[in-house]
Amino acid sequence: MNQSYGRLVSRAAIAATAMASLLLLIKIFAWWYTGSVSILAALVDSLVDIGASLTNLLVVRYSLQPADDNHSFGHGKAESLAALAQSMFISGSALFLFLTGIQHLVSPTPMTDPGVGVIVTIVALICTIILVSFQRWVVRRTQSQAVRADMLHYQSDVMMNGAILLALGLSWYGWHRADALFALGIGIYILYSALRMGYEAVQSLLDRALPDEERQEIIDIVTSWPGVSGAHDLRTRQSGPTRFIQIHLEMEDSLPLVQAHMVADQVEQAILRRFPGSDVIIHQDPCSVVPREGKRSMLS
Protein backbone atom coordinates (compact mmCIF):
# COMPACT_ATOMS: atom_id res chain seq x y z
CA MET A 1 0.00 0.00 0.00
CA ASN A 2 2.76 2.46 0.98
CA GLN A 3 4.52 2.03 -2.39
CA SER A 4 1.29 2.62 -4.30
CA TYR A 5 0.47 5.57 -2.03
CA GLY A 6 3.89 7.13 -2.54
CA ARG A 7 3.80 6.66 -6.31
CA LEU A 8 0.35 8.24 -6.72
CA VAL A 9 0.98 11.14 -4.34
CA SER A 10 4.34 11.95 -5.95
CA ARG A 11 2.82 11.88 -9.44
CA ALA A 12 0.05 14.22 -8.31
CA ALA A 13 2.59 16.68 -6.88
CA ILE A 14 4.75 16.55 -10.04
CA ALA A 15 1.68 17.03 -12.28
CA ALA A 16 0.55 20.04 -10.23
CA THR A 17 4.00 21.67 -10.39
CA ALA A 18 4.31 21.13 -14.14
CA MET A 19 0.79 22.42 -14.84
CA ALA A 20 1.28 25.51 -12.65
CA SER A 21 4.54 26.32 -14.48
CA LEU A 22 2.87 26.04 -17.89
CA LEU A 23 -0.08 28.20 -16.83
CA LEU A 24 2.26 30.82 -15.37
CA LEU A 25 3.99 31.31 -18.73
CA ILE A 26 0.65 31.58 -20.53
CA LYS A 27 -0.73 34.09 -18.02
CA ILE A 28 2.40 36.27 -18.10
CA PHE A 29 1.88 36.72 -21.84
CA ALA A 30 -1.86 37.35 -21.44
CA TRP A 31 -1.39 39.95 -18.70
CA TRP A 32 1.39 41.72 -20.64
CA TYR A 33 -0.82 41.83 -23.73
CA THR A 34 -4.17 42.83 -22.14
CA GLY A 35 -3.33 44.61 -18.86
CA SER A 36 -6.25 42.80 -17.18
CA VAL A 37 -6.18 42.92 -13.38
CA SER A 38 -8.16 39.67 -13.27
CA ILE A 39 -5.48 37.96 -15.33
CA LEU A 40 -2.85 39.53 -13.07
CA ALA A 41 -4.72 37.96 -10.15
CA ALA A 42 -4.60 34.60 -11.91
CA LEU A 43 -0.90 35.12 -12.66
CA VAL A 44 -0.11 35.76 -9.00
CA ASP A 45 -2.15 32.72 -8.07
CA SER A 46 -0.09 30.61 -10.49
CA LEU A 47 3.08 31.84 -8.78
CA VAL A 48 1.60 30.72 -5.48
CA ASP A 49 0.57 27.43 -7.11
CA ILE A 50 4.17 26.73 -8.11
CA GLY A 51 5.49 27.49 -4.64
CA ALA A 52 2.79 25.44 -2.96
CA SER A 53 3.13 22.48 -5.34
CA LEU A 54 6.93 22.45 -5.03
CA THR A 55 6.56 22.50 -1.25
CA ASN A 56 4.05 19.67 -1.56
CA LEU A 57 6.42 17.61 -3.70
CA LEU A 58 9.36 17.97 -1.30
CA VAL A 59 7.31 17.43 1.85
CA VAL A 60 5.40 14.45 0.45
CA ARG A 61 8.66 12.71 -0.43
CA TYR A 62 9.93 13.36 3.09
CA SER A 63 6.69 12.13 4.66
CA LEU A 64 7.01 8.80 2.83
CA GLN A 65 10.27 7.95 4.58
CA PRO A 66 9.88 4.98 6.95
CA ALA A 67 9.96 5.34 10.72
CA ASP A 68 13.40 5.66 12.31
CA ASP A 69 14.91 5.83 15.80
CA ASN A 70 14.00 9.51 16.20
CA HIS A 71 10.56 9.30 14.54
CA SER A 72 8.98 6.10 15.80
CA PHE A 73 5.60 6.88 14.25
CA GLY A 74 6.96 7.83 10.83
CA HIS A 75 7.01 11.20 9.08
CA GLY A 76 3.37 11.44 7.99
CA LYS A 77 2.72 14.68 9.89
CA ALA A 78 4.86 16.43 7.27
CA GLU A 79 1.80 16.23 4.99
CA SER A 80 -0.21 18.31 7.44
CA LEU A 81 2.63 20.83 7.63
CA ALA A 82 2.56 21.06 3.81
CA ALA A 83 -1.17 21.74 3.88
CA LEU A 84 -0.68 24.41 6.56
CA ALA A 85 2.08 26.03 4.50
CA GLN A 86 -0.21 26.05 1.46
CA SER A 87 -2.92 27.83 3.43
CA MET A 88 -0.40 30.56 4.29
CA PHE A 89 0.70 30.88 0.66
CA ILE A 90 -2.90 31.19 -0.47
CA SER A 91 -3.78 33.75 2.21
CA GLY A 92 -0.92 35.93 0.98
CA SER A 93 -2.16 35.78 -2.61
CA ALA A 94 -5.68 36.66 -1.45
CA LEU A 95 -4.35 39.79 0.31
CA PHE A 96 -2.54 40.82 -2.86
CA LEU A 97 -5.75 40.42 -4.86
CA PHE A 98 -7.68 42.59 -2.41
CA LEU A 99 -5.16 45.42 -2.68
CA THR A 100 -4.89 45.20 -6.47
CA GLY A 101 -8.66 44.94 -6.92
CA ILE A 102 -9.31 48.00 -4.75
CA GLN A 103 -6.70 50.00 -6.65
CA HIS A 104 -8.27 49.19 -10.03
CA LEU A 105 -11.78 49.70 -8.68
CA VAL A 106 -10.86 53.28 -7.75
CA SER A 107 -8.96 53.87 -11.00
CA PRO A 108 -10.27 51.45 -13.67
CA THR A 109 -8.05 50.90 -16.70
CA PRO A 110 -9.47 49.67 -20.05
CA MET A 111 -7.95 46.44 -21.35
CA THR A 112 -5.99 46.39 -24.60
CA ASP A 113 -7.50 43.24 -26.13
CA PRO A 114 -9.97 41.23 -24.00
CA GLY A 115 -10.24 38.61 -26.76
CA VAL A 116 -6.71 37.35 -26.11
CA GLY A 117 -7.51 37.16 -22.41
CA VAL A 118 -10.62 35.09 -23.14
CA ILE A 119 -8.66 32.56 -25.22
CA VAL A 120 -5.90 32.25 -22.62
CA THR A 121 -8.41 31.87 -19.79
CA ILE A 122 -10.29 29.11 -21.62
CA VAL A 123 -7.00 27.22 -22.12
CA ALA A 124 -6.15 27.68 -18.43
CA LEU A 125 -9.62 26.51 -17.41
CA ILE A 126 -9.38 23.30 -19.44
CA CYS A 127 -5.88 22.51 -18.14
CA THR A 128 -6.92 23.11 -14.53
CA ILE A 129 -10.03 20.93 -14.83
CA ILE A 130 -7.87 18.07 -16.15
CA LEU A 131 -5.46 18.47 -13.23
CA VAL A 132 -8.25 18.62 -10.61
CA SER A 133 -9.84 15.48 -12.06
CA PHE A 134 -6.54 13.62 -11.72
CA GLN A 135 -6.01 14.92 -8.19
CA ARG A 136 -9.54 13.89 -7.17
CA TRP A 137 -8.83 10.36 -8.42
CA VAL A 138 -5.58 10.27 -6.41
CA VAL A 139 -7.36 11.53 -3.26
CA ARG A 140 -10.00 8.80 -3.61
CA ARG A 141 -7.24 6.20 -3.80
CA THR A 142 -4.92 7.58 -1.09
CA GLN A 143 -6.84 10.02 1.15
CA SER A 144 -3.66 12.14 1.10
CA GLN A 145 -4.15 15.38 3.01
CA ALA A 146 -1.44 17.16 1.03
CA VAL A 147 -2.98 16.25 -2.34
CA ARG A 148 -6.46 17.12 -1.02
CA ALA A 149 -5.18 20.57 -0.01
CA ASP A 150 -3.60 21.03 -3.45
CA MET A 151 -6.84 19.90 -5.10
CA LEU A 152 -8.88 22.45 -3.11
CA HIS A 153 -6.42 25.09 -4.24
CA TYR A 154 -6.81 24.21 -7.92
CA GLN A 155 -10.57 23.93 -7.54
CA SER A 156 -10.51 27.58 -6.50
CA ASP A 157 -8.52 28.21 -9.70
CA VAL A 158 -11.36 26.71 -11.73
CA MET A 159 -13.76 29.14 -10.06
CA MET A 160 -11.27 31.95 -10.64
CA ASN A 161 -10.94 31.24 -14.35
CA GLY A 162 -14.71 31.11 -14.74
CA ALA A 163 -15.03 34.48 -13.00
CA ILE A 164 -12.26 35.93 -15.16
CA LEU A 165 -14.10 34.86 -18.32
CA LEU A 166 -17.21 36.68 -17.14
CA ALA A 167 -15.20 39.77 -16.15
CA LEU A 168 -13.44 39.87 -19.52
CA GLY A 169 -16.77 39.57 -21.30
CA LEU A 170 -18.24 42.48 -19.34
CA SER A 171 -15.11 44.59 -19.90
CA TRP A 172 -15.44 43.93 -23.62
CA TYR A 173 -18.78 45.74 -23.47
CA GLY A 174 -17.36 48.73 -21.60
CA TRP A 175 -17.90 47.83 -17.93
CA HIS A 176 -14.27 48.19 -16.91
CA ARG A 177 -14.87 48.02 -13.15
CA ALA A 178 -16.15 44.45 -13.55
CA ASP A 179 -12.54 43.30 -13.82
CA ALA A 180 -11.67 44.76 -10.40
CA LEU A 181 -14.92 43.59 -8.78
CA PHE A 182 -14.33 40.01 -9.86
CA ALA A 183 -10.74 40.22 -8.61
CA LEU A 184 -12.11 41.17 -5.17
CA GLY A 185 -14.64 38.32 -5.29
CA ILE A 186 -11.94 35.85 -6.28
CA GLY A 187 -9.80 37.07 -3.39
CA ILE A 188 -12.61 36.42 -0.91
CA TYR A 189 -13.13 32.89 -2.23
CA ILE A 190 -9.39 32.13 -2.12
CA LEU A 191 -9.14 33.40 1.47
CA TYR A 192 -12.07 31.20 2.48
CA SER A 193 -10.40 28.16 0.90
CA ALA A 194 -7.13 28.98 2.68
CA LEU A 195 -8.79 29.27 6.09
CA ARG A 196 -10.64 25.98 5.62
CA MET A 197 -7.44 24.26 4.48
CA GLY A 198 -5.48 25.65 7.42
CA TYR A 199 -8.15 24.50 9.87
CA GLU A 200 -8.03 20.93 8.56
CA ALA A 201 -4.22 20.89 8.72
CA VAL A 202 -4.19 22.15 12.32
CA GLN A 203 -6.79 19.55 13.33
CA SER A 204 -4.58 16.82 11.90
CA LEU A 205 -1.53 18.17 13.72
CA LEU A 206 -3.58 18.14 16.93
CA ASP A 207 -4.34 14.43 16.35
CA ARG A 208 -8.05 14.71 15.63
CA ALA A 209 -9.83 11.36 15.83
CA LEU A 210 -10.79 9.43 12.69
CA PRO A 211 -14.21 10.24 11.18
CA ASP A 212 -17.23 8.96 13.12
CA GLU A 213 -18.14 6.41 10.43
CA GLU A 214 -14.65 4.85 10.52
CA ARG A 215 -14.65 4.69 14.31
CA GLN A 216 -18.06 3.03 14.21
CA GLU A 217 -16.75 0.45 11.75
CA ILE A 218 -13.92 -0.36 14.17
CA ILE A 219 -16.37 -0.71 17.05
CA ASP A 220 -18.64 -2.97 14.96
CA ILE A 221 -15.71 -5.23 14.01
CA VAL A 222 -14.48 -5.51 17.60
CA THR A 223 -17.76 -5.95 19.45
CA SER A 224 -19.12 -8.56 17.03
CA TRP A 225 -16.05 -10.79 17.33
CA PRO A 226 -16.49 -14.18 19.09
CA GLY A 227 -14.84 -14.15 22.50
CA VAL A 228 -15.08 -10.37 22.92
CA SER A 229 -17.61 -9.31 25.57
CA GLY A 230 -17.13 -5.57 25.06
CA ALA A 231 -14.61 -2.83 24.36
CA HIS A 232 -13.63 0.61 25.63
CA ASP A 233 -11.02 3.38 25.36
CA LEU A 234 -10.99 3.56 21.56
CA ARG A 235 -8.39 6.11 20.50
CA THR A 236 -7.66 6.97 16.88
CA ARG A 237 -5.70 9.45 14.81
CA GLN A 238 -4.14 9.67 11.36
CA SER A 239 -0.66 10.71 10.23
CA GLY A 240 -0.20 10.82 6.47
CA PRO A 241 -1.51 7.52 5.05
CA THR A 242 -1.29 5.70 8.40
CA ARG A 243 -4.20 5.32 10.80
CA PHE A 244 -3.29 4.74 14.44
CA ILE A 245 -5.88 2.70 16.35
CA GLN A 246 -5.81 1.75 20.03
CA ILE A 247 -8.59 -0.12 21.84
CA HIS A 248 -9.17 -2.22 24.97
CA LEU A 249 -11.02 -5.53 24.58
CA GLU A 250 -13.16 -6.92 27.41
CA MET A 251 -13.00 -10.70 27.83
CA GLU A 252 -14.30 -13.27 30.30
CA ASP A 253 -12.12 -13.66 33.40
CA SER A 254 -11.86 -17.41 32.86
CA LEU A 255 -10.43 -17.10 29.34
CA PRO A 256 -6.82 -18.44 29.23
CA LEU A 257 -4.16 -15.85 28.43
CA VAL A 258 -3.06 -17.67 25.27
CA GLN A 259 -6.62 -17.78 23.96
CA ALA A 260 -7.17 -14.10 24.82
CA HIS A 261 -4.02 -13.27 22.88
CA MET A 262 -5.26 -15.27 19.87
CA VAL A 263 -8.61 -13.45 19.91
CA ALA A 264 -6.83 -10.08 20.06
CA ASP A 265 -4.64 -11.08 17.09
CA GLN A 266 -7.72 -12.08 15.10
CA VAL A 267 -9.41 -8.76 15.86
CA GLU A 268 -6.24 -6.90 14.86
CA GLN A 269 -6.12 -8.71 11.50
CA ALA A 270 -9.80 -7.96 10.90
CA ILE A 271 -9.18 -4.24 11.50
CA LEU A 272 -6.13 -4.33 9.19
CA ARG A 273 -8.18 -5.96 6.43
CA ARG A 274 -10.62 -3.07 6.63
CA PHE A 275 -7.96 -0.37 7.09
CA PRO A 276 -4.73 -1.63 5.44
CA GLY A 277 -1.48 -0.13 6.63
CA SER A 278 -2.87 0.89 10.02
CA ASP A 279 -0.91 0.77 13.27
CA VAL A 280 -3.15 -1.19 15.67
CA ILE A 281 -2.59 -1.67 19.40
CA ILE A 282 -5.01 -3.89 21.35
CA HIS A 283 -5.08 -4.39 25.12
CA GLN A 284 -7.06 -7.20 26.77
CA ASP A 285 -9.00 -6.56 30.01
CA PRO A 286 -10.89 -9.10 32.15
CA CYS A 287 -14.56 -8.10 32.36
CA SER A 288 -14.40 -7.89 36.17
CA VAL A 289 -11.83 -5.06 36.21
CA VAL A 290 -13.72 -2.79 33.81
CA PRO A 291 -16.25 -1.44 36.36
CA ARG A 292 -13.54 -1.00 38.99
CA GLU A 293 -11.48 1.13 36.59
CA GLY A 294 -14.52 3.27 35.86
CA LYS A 295 -14.61 2.27 32.19
CA ARG A 296 -17.80 2.18 30.20
CA SER A 297 -18.14 -0.66 27.74
CA MET A 298 -19.13 0.18 24.17
CA LEU A 299 -21.77 -2.54 24.42
CA SER A 300 -23.47 -1.06 27.49
Swiss-Prot record:
Stored InterPro entries: Cation_efflux, Cation_efflux_CTD, Cation_efflux_CTD_sf, Cation_efflux_FieF, Cation_efflux_TMD_sf, CDF_Transporter
Residue spans crossing the bilayer: 12-32, 39-59, 82-102, 114-134, 156-176, 178-198
Keyword rRNA processing: no
Catalytic reactions on record: Zn(2+)(in) + H(+)(out) = Zn(2+)(out) + H(+)(in); Cd(2+)(in) + H(+)(out) = Cd(2+)(out) + H(+)(in); Fe(2+)(in) + H(+)(out) = Fe(2+)(out) + H(+)(in)
GO molecular function: cadmium ion transmembrane transporter activity; ferrous iron transmembrane transporter activity; metal ion binding; zinc efflux antiporter activity
GO biological process: intracellular zinc ion homeostasis
Signal peptide (UniProt feature, chain positions): none
Recorded GO CC terms: plasma membrane
Keywords from the UniProt entry: Cell inner membrane, Cell membrane, Ion transport, Iron, Iron transport, Membrane, Metal-binding, Transmembrane, Transmembrane helix, Transport, Zinc, Zinc transport
Bilayer topology: Multi-pass membrane protein
Keyword Membrane: yes
Residues annotated for Zn(2+) binding in this entry: 45, 49, 153, 157
Chief localization: membrane
Coiled coil: none
Localization annotation: Cell inner membrane
Pfam families: Cation_efflux (PF01545), ZT_dimer (PF16916)
Reported function: Divalent metal cation transporter which exports Zn(2+), Cd(2+) and possibly Fe(2+). May be involved in zinc and iron detoxification by efflux.
Protein family membership: Belongs to the cation diffusion facilitator (CDF) transporter (TC 2.A.4) family. FieF subfamily.
Known partners and oligomeric status: Homodimer.
Protein name as it appears in the record: Cation-efflux pump FieF
